UniProtKB/Swiss-Prot annotation:
<dbReference type="GO" id="GO:0042026">
    <property type="term" value="P:protein refolding"/>
</dbReference>
<feature type="binding site">
    <location>
        <position position="495"/>
    </location>
    <ligand>
        <name>ATP</name>
    </ligand>
</feature>
<feature type="binding site">
    <location>
        <begin position="479"/>
        <end position="481"/>
    </location>
    <ligand>
        <name>ATP</name>
    </ligand>
</feature>
<dbReference type="InterPro" id="IPR027409">
    <property type="entry name" value="GroEL-like_apical_dom_sf"/>
</dbReference>
<feature type="binding site">
    <location>
        <begin position="87"/>
        <end position="91"/>
    </location>
    <ligand>
        <name>ATP</name>
    </ligand>
</feature>
<keyword id="KW-0067">ATP-binding</keyword>
<dbReference type="InterPro" id="IPR027413">
    <property type="entry name" value="GROEL-like_equatorial_sf"/>
</dbReference>
<dbReference type="InterPro" id="IPR001844">
    <property type="entry name" value="Cpn60/GroEL"/>
</dbReference>
<dbReference type="InterPro" id="IPR002423">
    <property type="entry name" value="Cpn60/GroEL/TCP-1"/>
</dbReference>
<keyword id="KW-0143">Chaperone</keyword>
<dbReference type="GO" id="GO:0005524">
    <property type="term" value="F:ATP binding"/>
</dbReference>
<feature type="binding site">
    <location>
        <position position="415"/>
    </location>
    <ligand>
        <name>ATP</name>
    </ligand>
</feature>
<keyword id="KW-0413">Isomerase</keyword>
<dbReference type="GO" id="GO:0140662">
    <property type="term" value="F:ATP-dependent protein folding chaperone"/>
</dbReference>
<dbReference type="GO" id="GO:0051082">
    <property type="term" value="F:unfolded protein binding"/>
</dbReference>
<dbReference type="InterPro" id="IPR018370">
    <property type="entry name" value="Chaperonin_Cpn60_CS"/>
</dbReference>
<feature type="binding site">
    <location>
        <position position="51"/>
    </location>
    <ligand>
        <name>ATP</name>
    </ligand>
</feature>
């Protein structure tokens, strides 16, 4: 086992705080509408330019191991806030720095670290309650667009495109972000349920222009096994032919004689049929077939529930207004399922989302909710260079997370104002002893830090602006973008409550751990081995003169 280097007390905390300051100073330069860019070196290719706090934090590793520990703990604050709320990483870092710096000073002055921590926790708990009190639910598209705009570093086009996407696919809908091919941002919306399986034979195509098979008001047969014998399909095909409607078959596989017969029937115009493979594999395939059954008001023909394909009738089939099948995708639009049954199914999947511990499973379950509840929107990010594309895509993803958080817990006035209002409301708190009361004061002072940093980045005097904001009430604050005072909500400067709350709670959690740290252990630096002695020179070659 390698030898360890151990630091105690003040020496340990001083080094840790030094690391915190290095990371926080780099991250906080990006805060606010007039925040600066940070350039990150890459091992190959052009450097990355970003205004995203968590991207900056992730790049920082310090040479001194004790300083690096401090930096990594604050990095944890940024990452945790990003995971919880999707944004607010820079705010969380600024809060953590302020709490740690003041807390370390108090410990150095002889105060009890545990009492300081209790005081900080007490103040944060009261501030979170106050944040929830001043929070307002987001009900309209305008508020959603404003939240997205602020999170995307005041880029209105991003805020508007996210609001439009949410309007089209609903609050539960899946919105994905991809790299586009143009210069402008684009929005593609797929309404209804889409899955990534196309037609099994090109002979099913009936729309030559789009090279797709379009079915209007079709019946939908859902089967969880292979179909190779056409006799099994005859009762269903006869019923559909009598009704004069097209048919979509979704099964594990349609092959051989069955597929050939369906193609011949389609070409001759007897019955318009399209066959596709069922999406997914194993249990996920069964679940997705059940989703389709609920959406279309049909039944999955499965031996597990005692239904055989040859016994199936037209009553077991689902319905939809329209189905479009391309080479790679199938889209079911406006299924005829019962809305109460769909809601119940969505609720069931949401329960599974809460219970699962796998990120992959959670993502797949959320996709299923979206397909049942609304649809899927794809935001294609446009930019003129690859560097700009990466930076812009990161901002769009941030803004999307922030708007989801706003829909979840509502919004508070932005620009650091919500924390200032919360600290004024809980300003008369006192602890059980003097040290706890000092801990409360540290937390209250730290809650001013985000506003101070936004103002400093805008080139103004933080204390002057802060006092003026404190004199106001409610949503009154400072718009750093244009230097005006006024109602932050009217200015469109909003923060999701969840983002502000998570930033404060995570910063307090890490600050409490750091203040109460008394020893730090790291690997001792290895001593450099002495270099090999230089080799002797080659002997002269006698008798040769130059």
């Amino acid at each position: 086992m390698a030898a360890k280097d151990i630091r105690f007390g003040e020496d340990a905390r001083t080094r840790m705080v030094r690391g915190v300051n290095v990371l926080a100073n780099a991250v906080k330069a990006t805060l606010g509408p007039k925040g600066r860019n940070v350039v990150l070196e890459k091992s190959f290719g052009a450097p990355t330019i970003t205004k995203d706090g968590v991207s900056v934090a992730k790049e920082i590793e310090l040479a001194d191991k004790f300083e690096n520990m401090g930096a990594q703990m604050v990095k944890e604050v940024a990452s945790k806030t990003n995971d919880n709320a999707g944004d607010g990483t820079t705010t969380a870092t600024v809060l953590a720095q302020a709490l740690i710096r003041e807390g370390a000073k108090a410990v150095a002055a002889g105060m009890n670290p545990m009492d300081l921590k209790r005081g900080i926790d007490q103040a944060v708990k009261a501030a979170v309650v106050e944040l929830k009190n001043i929070s307002k639910p987001t009900t309209d598209d305008k508020a959603i667009a404003q939240v997205g705009t602020i999170s995307a570093n005041s880029d209105e086009s991003i805020g508007n495109i996210i609001a439009e996407a949410m309007k089209k696919v609903g609050k539960e809908g899946v919105i994905t972000v991809e790299e586009g091919s143009g210069l402008e941002n684009e929005l593609d919306v797929v309404e209804g349920m889409q899955f990534d399986r196309g037609y099994l034979s090109p002979y099913f195509i009936n729309n030559q222009q789009s090279q797709s098979a379009d079915l209007d008001d079709p019946f939908i047969l859902l089967h969880d096994k292979k179909i190779s014998n056409v006799r099994d399909l005859l009762p269903v095909l006869e019923g559909v032919a009598k009704a004069g409607k097209p048919l979509l078959i979704v099964a594990e596989e349609v092959e051989g004689e069955a597929l050939a017969t369906l193609v011949v029937n389609t070409i001759r115009g007897i019955v318009k049929v399209v066959a596709v493979k069922a999406p997914g594999f194993g249990d996920r395939r069964k679940a997705m077939l059940e989703d389709m059954a609920v959406l279309t008001g049909g039944t999955v023909i499965s031996e597990e529930v005692g239904l055989a394909l040859e016994k199936a009738t037209i009553k077991d089939l689902g319905r939809a207004k329209k189905v479009q099948v391309s080479k790679e995708n199938t889209t079911i639009i406006d299924g005829a399922g019962d809305s109460a049954a769909i809601e119940s199914r969505v609720g069931q999947i949401k329960t599974q989302i809460e219970d699962t511990s796998s990120d992959y499973d959670r993502e797949k379950l959320q996709e299923r909710v979206a397909k049942l509840a609304g649809g899927v929107a794809v935001i294609k990010v446009g930019a003129s260079t690859e560097i700009e594309m990466k930076e812009k895509k990161a901002r769009v993803e941030d803004a999307l997370h922030a708007t989801r958080a706003a829909v979840e817990e509502g919004v508070v006035p932005g620009g650091g104002v919500a924390l200032v209002r919360a600290l004024v409301a809980v300003g008369n708190l006192t602890g059980a002893n003097e040290d706890q009361t000092h801990g409360i004061q540290i937390a209250l002072r730290a809650m001013e830090a985000p506003l101070r940093e936004i103002v400093a980045n805008a080139g103004e005097e933080p204390s002057v602006i802060l006092n003026k904001v404190k004199e106001g009430t409610g949503n009154y604050g400072y718009n750093a973008a244009n230097g005006e005072f006024g109602d932050m909500v009217e200015f469109g400067i909003l923060d999701p409550t969840k983002v502000t709350r998570s930033a404060l709670q995570n910063a307090a959690s890490i600050a409490g751990l750091m203040i109460t740290t008394e020893a730090m252990v790291a690997d001792a630096p290895k001593k450099d081995e002495p270099a090999m002695p230089a080799g002797g020179g080659m002997g002269g070659m006698g008798g040769m003169d130059f």
